[in-house]
Design a protein with these regions (language model features):
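A structural signal for the main folded, soluble domain(s) of proteins
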Residues: 1, 61-64, 75, 80-91, ...
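Conserved beta-strand hairpin/beta-sheet module of binuclear metal-dependent hydrolase folds
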Residues: 1-56, 136-154
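Residue-level signal for inorganic ion chemistry
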Residues: 6, 49, 186, 211, ...
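Short, well-ordered beta-strand micro-motif
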Residues: 9-11, 27-29, 117, 124, ...
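Active-site HxH/HxHxD metal-binding segment of metal-dependent hydrolases
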Residues: 21, 40-122
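Metallo-beta-lactamase
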Residues: 33-35, 40-43, 122-214
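Histidine-centered divalent metal-coordination motifs
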Residues: 67-73, 131, 186, 249
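C-terminal regulatory/interaction regions
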Residues: 214-324
């Protein structure tokens, strides 16, 4: 999908509620190519990106950058380095969070105010913490295109870690010059860029007012109880995410001295429960490894069938000759 003369979007369909509509990878530049985000380390992301590169007659990537460390944005970095020769660019405060996903070489770090200079376009790097501690946005001022990762989504609202940081990041973005189009990490493009950012700011203010009203009206509540009142009809699969956003608001209100907190008591897991969880995690990883080996074997078999005569279909193949 062509966004501007400098930007193309590869939108990989998703059916998970936390990734509304699609997970997006962006190609920037008409000469040297920059990718923004990589998708997960599974075949649908690899093949859609490679198919798109082939369609636009590209065989290499110059730089593979990410907006933050979450797996659906950074899972394919090793593959982009190994298969397409990309230099990998990650947030300077996200290297530790990306442990296990970075290639052995060809890694550079990005900080607020840095630029990525391609043959025909300059991309600004903006630190926008809030969704995650290492969140970055990328901005092409001449096109008015802002790549937001999960700081802003194409549909709905995002999850928030530190609400104070997040509000400051939104305010910074809404004040960018020439802002026109938002390219989010998930979902469709947003063409009313400044209005959507202001909607996000207003939404967080509204949620804060709602939380305070719940506490004034009903007395002490847990974050989960507040969440159920604020989001009575939410998809149950999104309840934990909504509870996280409520807790982010409560933490900011506590820090400002506007509410008091009565400490809870965490449940201490029993040794047998911990052991079962570890065993299940080992089993889960083993299943994933077996599935990946199976997929690799299937691919090898598919290619072998292209290279050899179809002896598994024919005991003797038809032959053809001139009828004289």
């Amino acid at each position: 999908m062509q966004v501007t003369p400098h930007v193309r979007a590869v939108q990989v369909p998703e059916d998970e509620p936390m990734r509304p509509g699609s997970t997006n990878i962006y190609l920037v530049g008409s000469g040297q190519t920059l990718t923004i985000d990589s998708g997960e380390a599974i075949d649908k992301f690899r093949w859609m990106l490679r198919g798109y590169l082939a369609a636009v007659e590209r065989s290499e990537i110059g730089v593979a950058a990410v907006t933050h460390h979450h797996y659906d944005h950074s899972g394919n970095l090793k593959d982009l380095r190994a298969a397409l020769g990309a230099e990998v660019a990650v947030p300077d405060n996200g290297v530790g969070l990306l442990r296990g996903r970075l290639p052995a070489d060809g890694v550079q770090t990005l900080h607020d105010g840095a630029t990525i200079d391609l043959d025909d376009v300059r991309v600004q790097v903006l630190a926008t913490p809030g969704h995650s501690v290492d969140s970055l946005c990328y901005y092409i001022e001449e096109d008015g295109v802002l790549f937001t990762g999960d700081t802003l989504l194409g549909v709905g609202t995002t999850t928030v870690g530190n609400l104070g940081d997040y509000r400051r990041s939104l305010q910074r973005l809404v004040e960018l010059p020439n802002l026109q189009v938002l390219c989010p990490g998930h979902g469709p493009l947003v063409h009313d860029a400044r209005e959507r950012l202001q909607t996000y700011i207003d939404h967080r203010n509204m949620r804060e007012d709602q939380i305070l009203r719940v506490l004034r009206r009903g007395g002490p509540r847990t974050s989960w109880e507040i969440m159920l009142q604020l989001y009575p009809d939410i998809d149950k699969r999104l309840r934990a995410a909504a509870d996280g956003n409520v807790r982010a608001h409560l933490e900011q209100l506590r820090g400002e001295g506007r509410i008091r907190v009565t400490p809870g008591r965490k449940r201490k897991p029993r040794a047998d429960v911990v052991a079962r969880r570890k065993a299940k995690e080992r089993e889960r990883r083993a299943v994933i490894r077996r599935a990946r080996r199976f997929e690799a074997a299937q691919r090898r078999e598919l290619w072998r069938r292209q290279e050899e005569p179809p002896t598994d279909t024919w005991t003797r193949q038809p032959t053809y000759a001139i009828d004289e």
